[in-house]
Amino acid sequence: MARHPRWTLSQVTELFEKPLLELLFEAQQIHRQHFDPQQVQVSTLLSIKTGACPEDCKYCPQSSRYKTGLEAERLMEVEQVLDSARKAKNAGSTRFCMGAAWKNPHERDMPYLEQIVQGVKAMGLETCMTLGMLNESQAQRLANAGLDYYNHNLDTSPEFYGNIITTRTYQERLDTLEKVREAGIKVCSGGIVGLGETVTDRAGLLLQLANLPTPPESVPINMLVKVKGTPLADNDDVDAFDFIRTIAVARIMMPTSYVRLSAGREQMNEQTQAMCFMAGANSIFYGCKLLTTPNPAEDKDLQLFRKLGLNPQQTRVLAGDNEQQQRLEQTLMTPDTDDYYNAAAL
């Protein structure tokens, strides 16, 4: 059963056509019904395996098909990941997201992934991963390890999708979201503005997300970061008001979801970001880099928070800074079965 009434494309189109200030007012009212408007959830994103991805996503510098100057890197060592998580927590993040440039993880990678989830969770941080497509077994193993969120974006509308990606179908993305949900992991899924899509495509993306059996708990809205060497490097800039409008419509359609102001913040001024928060955005990525693209420095974000009277949201998780953390960190690098496989060692 759907948690909310199903939306139609005509209803979503009507929202996009509303006068902007009226739309912002409606979005802010809905936002205040479900969230503290002064609280912003703060996440940090780390690339645990960079580049050499076999996919052909036209926006992505990590694709092996494009010459962007990005050098491929092997999987990070477990302790490197945990050290980055500690730094993220000390900087104020409450959720640590880990991404790998894969079409999908291999079975041999699963023990490594399970261990870093357990290690990060033991620090009292929420955990999130984006690893490509998952099968049922992989989703359940990550759930059993304690993974809180799994990110798998739809990127755009079903109609425009084939113009951007051909190596993975839209239905495969939806199937992964279903497997994640069935495993008991919270869903993080959103899209990108600036791919060359129309307003109808933006409406179609949000329609897909909002009409999932349960809408995503987290909805990242990205502004395209144009990277030289990718097919979309010369795309037109996104109008700030169009981006703000997309945030507002997402908030109205998914009132209880966290709407994340995601990639592209480095190219937004403070006024644009402030209007995004007014439109209902209540989550950001914090730190100087999102996988391989720039993000505002931590001190700039703190200054903006002070100017706007915003505060990082505090999150409690079941595992915290206690003896469990010490025990896990002592055993993380010690194989306990003959089948132990350390993906980082390859």
Curated annotation (Swiss-Prot):
What Pfam families does the entry give? BATS, Radical_SAM
Gene Ontology molecular function: any one: biotin synthase activity
Documented EC number(s): 2.8.1.6
Biological process terms from the Gene Ontology for this record are: biotin biosynthetic process
The pathway to which it is assigned is: Cofactor biosynthesis; biotin biosynthesis; biotin from 7,8-diaminononanoate: step 2/2
Mind telling me which InterPro entries this protein's record contains?
Answer: Aldolase_TIM, BATS_dom, Biotin_synth/BioAB, Biotin_synthase, Elp3/MiaA/NifB-like_rSAM, rSAM
Q: Which reaction does it catalyse?
A: (4R,5S)-dethiobiotin + (sulfur carrier)-SH + 2 reduced [2Fe-2S]-[ferredoxin] + 2 S-adenosyl-L-methionine = (sulfur carrier)-H + biotin + 2 5'-deoxyadenosine + 2 L-methionine + 2 oxidized [2Fe-2S]-[ferredoxin]
Q: Which UniProt keywords apply?
A: 2Fe-2S, 4Fe-4S, Biotin biosynthesis, Iron, Iron-sulfur, Metal-binding, S-adenosyl-L-methionine, Transferase
Q: Which cofactor does it need?
A: [4Fe-4S] cluster; [2Fe-2S] cluster
In this chain, [2Fe-2S] cluster is annotated as bound at 97, 128, 188, 260
Which residue numbers delimit the Radical SAM core domain?
38-256
| CDD domains, per the entry | Radical_SAM
Chain sites annotated for binding [4Fe-4S] cluster: 53, 57, 60
- What does the record say about how the cofactor binds? Binds 1 [4Fe-4S] cluster. The cluster is coordinated with 3 cysteines and an exchangeable S-adenosyl-L-methionine. Binds 1 [2Fe-2S] cluster. The cluster is coordinated with 3 cysteines and 1 arginine.
Q: How does it assemble?
A: Homodimer.
Q: Which family does it belong to?
A: Belongs to the radical SAM superfamily. Biotin synthase family.
Which NCBIfam families does the annotation name?
bioB
State what this protein does: Catalyzes the conversion of dethiobiotin (DTB) to biotin by the insertion of a sulfur atom into dethiobiotin via a radical-based mechanism.
Protein name as it appears in the record: Biotin synthase
The record lists the organism as Salmonella heidelberg (strain SL476)
User: What gene is behind this protein?
Assistant: bioB
